[in-house]
């Protein structure tokens, strides 16, 4: 199966979705991530679990996480 950006999250083979421990128990507005077998990272909306998944390379995901950690996206 070819993994592509925007494909239905339900079509991703054998993935374990995770969300932040800071997410509330009701779920609803959470982002979930899954590491794919080839090292890419898929991201989906927990409200629409069968909806589209965004797929990032490991380098793209590392850059995003690093930017978030460093405050690059903080509003001033």
Protein language model annotation of sequence segments:
Residues 7, 12, 49-51, 68:
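Residue-level signal for pocket-adjacent positions within structured domains
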Residues 20-59, 63:
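A short, structured beta-strand/loop element
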Residues 1-30:
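N-terminal first-folded block
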Residues 56-76:
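Mixed-charge, Lys/Arg-enriched low-complexity segments
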Residues 4, 36-37, 48, 72-76:
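Boundary-flanking segments of nucleic-acid-binding domains in nuclear regulatory proteins
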